[in-house]
Amino acid sequence: LTVRRSVALSRAVYENEAEVEDLKGVLVKDAAEADRILQRGEIPVLVDPEADIIGSFHPDVVVDAILAKKNLGTRITDAPFVIGVGPGFYAGKDCHCVIETKRGHTLGNVIWEKEAIPNTGVPGNIGGFTTERLIRASADGIMEPVAEIGDTVEKGQLVARTGKQPVYAKMSGIVRGMLQKDVQVTEGL
């Protein structure tokens, strides 16, 4: 699932292709197809939860940017250079370096020893708002967005339906992320 879809090549999983600035991602099924896409100067996007392609593709660099807040299986031996993004990775153990993702003056720092700042479970404070900034599923079911990324919304405005239940904005502002239509969600996601 991708929330910030306008800046993520992962949306190619649902759209077959995705562009972010001057980069184009193309959905592929295997290593051979990935190699063809790379030869065209484009980025292959592959659904591979176990990262099995690493064994046959032998990449020079692996970047785990799943943002799961924990390491789901990335190993420092996966490639000559392995990067973990966000909490859950320990530089020198799980990967060669970690990129800090916590909002603030350390955002984007490269960590060569130790780990990223642990996940607090609370979004960064912007203008006095933390959890209110999130749009969460009100019920299990299919996601039906009403608002789109970039829309200005008011507090209390209907922004989506999940499992046919309404989801309302908890604050006024601009929608910066929204799951795509027709994905299965669970309450609270």
Annotate each predicted stretch with a short phrase:
Residues L1-L189:
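Well-ordered secondary-structure scaffolds
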